[in-house]
C-alpha cells in the first residue's frame, strides 16, 4: 500500500516539476530576447550569439522576423542546453511550427517563436492536459 502511495506522490511531483520547468524555460527565453535586443540599442554590432546583426539605432526596431530567426538559431545551438522538460529535446521549435492555441500531449513544453508586425511572440504550452488553454503562456515583446 505504501508503495502505491509513493508512486502517486512521485508522479505528482514530476508533473509539477515539468510544468514549472516549462514555465521557467518560457520566461528565460522572453527575458533573453529582451536583454539581447537591448545590446543593439547600446551600440553593439551583433547580439544573440552573433546570430543577429544590429542595425543603426536610428533604424530600430530591427526586423522582427530577423530577431525571431536569430532567437531560434541561438536557442537550438548545441550549447544552448535548454530542453523540453517532457521530451528532453530542444525546447525552442523550428521556424514554421504552428502556434499552439490549446495544450496537448504533443506540444507540451514546446516554445514557439513567431512575429506579429514589429513584435516577437513567445508561446509555450506548460502542461499536458489536452484541450486546455489555461496552461498556455504567451508573451509579446515589442521591438519599438
Q: Residue ranges of each PLM-predicted region?
A:
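Amphipathic alpha-helical segments typified by the pilin-like N-terminal helix
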Residues: 1-28
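A general marker of short, structured functional hotspots
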Residues: 6-9, 33, 82
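Extended, polar beta-sheet/loop recognition surfaces of beta-rich domains
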Residues: 20-44
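Periplasmic/extracellular, small/polar-rich flexible segments of pilin-like filament-forming proteins
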Residues: 35-144
Amino acid at each position: 500500500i505504501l508503495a502505491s502511495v509513493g508512486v502517486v506522490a512521485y508522479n505528482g511531483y514530476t508533473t509539477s516539476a515539468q510544468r514549472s520547468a516549462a514555465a521557467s524555460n518560457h520566461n528565460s527565453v522572453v527575458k533573453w530576447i529582451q536583454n539581447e535586443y537591448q545590446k543593439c540599442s547600446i551600440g553593439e554590432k551583433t547580439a544573440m550569439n552573433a546570430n543577429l546583426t544590429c542595425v543603426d539605432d536610428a533604424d530600430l526596431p530591427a526586423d522582427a522576423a530577423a530577431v525571431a530567426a536569430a532567437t531560434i538559431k541561438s536557442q537550438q545551438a548545441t550549447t544552448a542546453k535548454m530542453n523540453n522538460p517532457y521530451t528532453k529535446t530542444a525546447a525552442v521549435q523550428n521556424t514554421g511550427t504552428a502556434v499552439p492555441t490549446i495544450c496537448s500531449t504533443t506540444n507540451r513544453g514546446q516554445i514557439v517563436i513567431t512575429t506579429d508586425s514589429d513584435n516577437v511572440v513567445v508561446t509555450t504550452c506548460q502542461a499536458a492536459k489536452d484541450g486546455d488553454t489555461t496552461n498556455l503562456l504567451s508573451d509579446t515583446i515589442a521591438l519599438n
